[in-house]
Structure formats: structure tokens, C-alpha cells
Amino acid sequence: MADVRTNIQSIDPVWEQIQDEARQAVLDEPLVGGFVHACILHHKSLEKALSYRVAAKLASNEMSMVVVREIVEEAYAAEPALVAASRADLVAIFERDPACHRLLQPILYFKGYQAIQAYRVGHYLWTQGHHDLAYFFQMRVSEIFGVDIHPAARIGRGIMIDHAHSIVIGETAVVGDNVSMLHSVTLGGTGKEEEDRHPKIGNGVL
């Protein structure tokens, strides 16, 4: 068993650390055991855990958790860069946010991280021509998290949105890699009626 765990860690050390943190969380706080098992320990990979978490947050009477989860899993399977970006976002938060002490925290508790992962799936759907599905994801992210990101907006990797309250990112906005945002940020339109009308944020900007 030790050899198997070593092999897993060499393949995905981020996921292995998340699982270790989840097991410790259950020992420390047994009352959250069911929640932590459902979100982390029942899953074999980060993408499976994220599929569950995003679906659990976005599901509604209009679209079931099963359907949302299938959409997310299909997106992850078709576009591995989505999961790579989710890892980069996770590490960015862990490294930059003094309130983040474990990789586990953003997946379970940080709405900024959760909102960005849902946006990434919505953006993938948009690029594949599934605009109404993408708009549904945008609507639910706005309703649940208070983060309104147009699915056509282009956002890089390693993103941290601290507190993630009242965030608006418009259709033609571009956000580079390794960007950190605080709350109440609006990348709104310039007044043009069409084409390129939103701000562009370069790499490494706070």
C-alpha cells in the first residue's frame, strides 16, 4: 500500500496533499466528516472532486446536480487544460492568501475559487458553441457566489479572487496569468456598442 501511495503522490502530489488534509480534517472535526468525505475523500482525482463540488453548488430545480456534474466531467475529459488551470489557481491561493493554510480550503470553502472553476467550464462551453449552457453557468455563478463573469471573457491561470464579493468581468475582458483580485472589482464596458469594449489585465497584476 505504501508503494501505491508513493506512486500516486509522484503523479499528483497536489491531490495527495488535499486528501491528507481532508483525512486530518475529519479527525479534527468529526461533525464535518460527511461533508469532507462527499467533497474530497469519495473521489479518486481532483477533477472528480471539482466536478462534484461545482455541481453541488450550481445545481437547482432547473438543472439537476447529476446533469451539471456530467457537463463538468465531460468538459474536464475533453479539455485537460481546465484541470491544469484549477491546480494553478489552487496553488496561487495557497501561496498568496495568508488566510489559506491548506490546499483543501479553497475547494471546500472559498467562493472565489469555486466561482472561477465554474466560469472555466462555462468558458469551455462557450468556445464549443454551447452558448445557452454557458449562460446558465454564468447565471448560477452570479446567483450563488455574487460573481458575474461573462463566459466569453478570457481568464488565465493562477488566479486568486480574495473574498470574491461583487466581481464583474465583461464579455471582451482579458485577465492574464497569476492575477490577484480583491472584492468589488468591475471590468466593465467602455461604452462601445460592440467589439472590444472591456479592460485588459496583464500577467502578475494585483
Give, region by region, the residue ranges found by the protein language model.
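Terminal amphipathic alpha-helical/low-complexity segments used for targeting or macromolecular assembly
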Residues: M1-R140
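Beta-solenoid/beta-rich acyl/carboxylate-transfer cores
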Residues: G146-M160, A164-S180, S184-T186, T190-L206
